Amino acid sequence: MFDAFTKVVAQADARGQFISASEIDALAAMVSDSNKRLDAVNRISSNASTIVASAARQLFAQQPSLIAPGGNAYTSRRMAACLRDMEIILRYVTYASFAGDASVLEDRCLNGLRETYLALGTPGASVAAGVNLMKESALAIVNDRAGISAGDCASLSSEIGTYFDRAAAAVA
């Protein structure tokens, strides 16, 4: 996993060049937005159980066959596994959001996840729908202006959304 700074240094080193002005500008913008980033990650982390529970409730309301006898989330053990997986994905989205880089999400969470779900018979489309529901809930919390650093969060919100999109695409 690389944070944004380490990634820029590694790329410049691989090119055998100094860090470019545009790379420095991009990192400077990230630093100037760091309080917003920390606020966003803190808000998602502090509301993780609510985000997961809300997404699960909505998912099971939309796809009741998942919790019906024979469904993939039927029995408390399977339901717990589903909620655990949603929480793990959300946790890695927060790591990527904090670092400003998706590599931790890709390398430690999503790599091989689709294959695992296929082997277990877990419907990837349902997992992707759950991830998208978590995205909606998390972004609503991030975009709530009450009690956070002043400023436009559109860019950060968009970035966080892409991490959820990567997760949904990886399992669909």
UniProtKB/Swiss-Prot annotation:
Binding-site residues, (2R,3E)-phycocyanobilin: C82
One Gene Ontology cellular component: phycobilisome
Membrane topology per record: Peripheral membrane protein
Modified residues (N4-methylasparagine): N72
Biological process (GO), any one: photosynthesis
Keyword Membrane on entry: yes
Keywords: Antenna complex, Bile pigment, Chromophore, Electron transport, Membrane, Methylation, Photosynthesis, Phycobilisome, Thylakoid, Transport
Gene3D superfamilies: Phycocyanins
InterPro entries reported for this sequence: Globin-like_sf (IPR009050), Phycobilisome_asu/bsu (IPR012128), Phycobilisome_asu/bsu_sf (IPR038719), Phycocyanin_b (IPR006247)
Post-translational modification: Contains two covalently linked bilin chromophores.
Cysteine pairs bridged by disulfides in the record: none
Main subcellular location: membrane
Protein's cellular compartments: Cellular thylakoid membrane
NCBIfam families reported for this sequence: phycocy_beta
Function: Light-harvesting photosynthetic bile pigment-protein from the phycobiliprotein complex (phycobilisome, PBS). Phycocyanin is the major phycobiliprotein in the PBS rod.
Family label: Belongs to the phycobiliprotein family.
Subunit structure: Heterodimer of an alpha and a beta subunit, which further assembles into trimers and the trimers into hexamers.
Protein name: R-phycocyanin beta subunit
Origin organism lineage: Bacteria, Bacillati, Cyanobacteriota, Cyanophyceae, Synechococcales
